[in-house]
Curated annotation (Swiss-Prot):
Organism of origin: Limosilactobacillus fermentum (strain NBRC 3956 / LMG 18251) (Lactobacillus fermentum)
Location of the protein in the cell: Cytoplasm
Cellular component, GO annotation: cytoplasm
Pathway where it operates: Amino-acid degradation; L-arginine degradation via ADI pathway; carbamoyl phosphate from L-arginine: step 1/2
GO biological process: arginine catabolic process to ornithine; arginine deiminase pathway
EC number: 3.5.3.6
Protein's UniProt name: Arginine deiminase
NCBIfam families in alphabetical order: arcA, PRK01388.1
């Protein structure tokens, strides 16, 4: 049986991808709430939607099937029993296990169609949306100035992070910050209950862990090699955990853990390092030292289910050995210029989405990086980016590959 998920590289021809079109959740961001919701600016929704539609159409024009996260979720909740279970879990993860507020939220959301319910949960439920005759103590004693009963999910258009397709399976991720943790609950229901996926997908690591990992840090370099960022959003123990699972149950035998700065500008590995061809990568120069090196650790299967760990600094040498390539071409964001590079990296100049070997989708605003990619023989499809980029994520962040051709 052919698996509905199949991703054995970052660069194999992209056949199917999952996106989320930004919705009214974006309009629930205000300056006072940006930090809690992990934003540092507020996109203008109508233009963000136009830009996202242009991005989706760019992918379709290359023959790529585009699925939508919110539609898959609604289809996964077609069964009344599944919908009830999902709703109880979502409300509990929003802070209400029982009580009048829990019951009011349940009644308010349950009377909607599955699509309306999913859209509203992502949008967020304001206190003014529901008339609670007698609020419980929890509601009146906590966050009295906070306007939401259920927080919005404005980061949902970055579909890369709640999960990651690896081989014929998936990791359903425990995300780092509360603002995003409920997104992967939606993923769990898609994988377990959507007819396209249910019972057909290996879950390499589920979301029921204390340690965190996010899809922006998970790069599938080949059919047996992963690179994973040790970052603000992904912990070392989570990397060891998923490595053990993959070594035991899959063809993967190498995980390269790459250390990057733990800050918002470089929150994931794919904001500073992406694979764009068999032997070519984009890299933000700020993660490399004066010798062009970066701390990394190579994990392999050991005895009795354990793993071996080797420390390295020469990332080129590690990649050459792992990928069996005579040379590796690291293409610097912003051509390495001390002003251009951080500016374009801030606007996701390193966050390229490969749709085939040597063919990528990028934001048009990063014109220095795009010109350099073209000089290195890369075919570049530029997409509009004035509003989408305000969320600090680029084309790779906004896409979750479901199927790629093998190399």
């Amino acid at each position: 049986m052919t698996s509905p998920i199949h991703v054995t590289s970052e660069i194999g021809k992209l056949k199917t991808v999952m996106l989320h079109r930004p919705g009214r959740e974006i309009e629930n961001i205000t300056p006072d709430y940006m930090e809690r919701l992990l934003f540092d600016d507020i996109p203008y929704l109508p233009i963000a939607q136009e830009e996202h539609d242009f991005f989706a159409q760019t992918l379709r024009d290359q023959g790529i099937e585009v699925l939508y996260f919110e539609k898959l979720a609604a289809e996964a909740l077609a069964s009344d029993d599944v919908r009830k279970e999902f709703l109880n879990r979502m409300i509990a993860e929003s802070g209400y296990v029982a009580g009048t507020t829990h019951d009011a939220l349940y009644d308010y959301l349950y009377q909607m169609t599955p699509q309306e319910m999913v859209d509203k949960i992502i949008e967020g439920v304001r206190g003014t949306d529901i008339d609670i005759a007698q609020p419980d103590l929890q509601s009146v004693s906590e966050n009295t100035d906070w306007p939401f009963l259920m927080d919005p999910m404005p980061n949902a258009y970055f579909t890369r992070d709640p999960q990651a397709s690896i081989g014929d399976g998936i990791s359903i991720n425990k995300m780092t910050f509360p603002a995003r943790q409920r997104e992967s609950l939606i993923t769990e229901y898609i994988i377990n209950h959507h007819p396209r996926f249910a019972g057909q997908v290996e879950v390499w690591r589920d979301r029921n862990h204390e340690s965190h990992i996010e899809g922006g840090d998970e790069l599938v370099l080949s059919d047996h090699v992963l690179a994973i960022g040790v970052s603000q959003r992904t912990t070392a123990d989570a990397i060891e955990d998923i490595a053990r699972n993959l070594f035991k149950d899959s063809n993967y035998d190498t995980v390269i853990a790459i250390s990057i700065p733990h800050n918002h500008a470089m929150m994931h590995l794919d904001t500073v390092f992406t694979m764009i061809n068999h032997d070519q990568f984009t890299v933000h120069p700020a993660i490399l030292d004066d010798k062009g090196e970066v701390d990394n650790w190579v994990l392999h299967p050991g005895k009795d289910g354990e793993i071996t760990i080797e420390h390295h600094t020469d990332i080129k040498a590690v990649l050459k050995q792992a990928l069996n390539k005579p040379e590796i071409d690291l293409i610097p964001t912003g051509n390495g210029d001390p002003i251009v590079a951080p500016r374009e990296q801030w606007n996701d100049g390193s966050n390229t989405l490969a749709i085939a070997p040597g063919e990528v989708v990028t934001y048009n605003r990063n014109y220095v990086s795009n010109a350099l990619l073209k000089e290195h023989g890369i075919l570049v499809h530029e997409v509009r980016s004035s509003e989408l980029s305000r969320g600090r994520g680029g084309p790779r962040c906004m896409s979750c590959p479901i199927v790629r051709e093998d190399l």
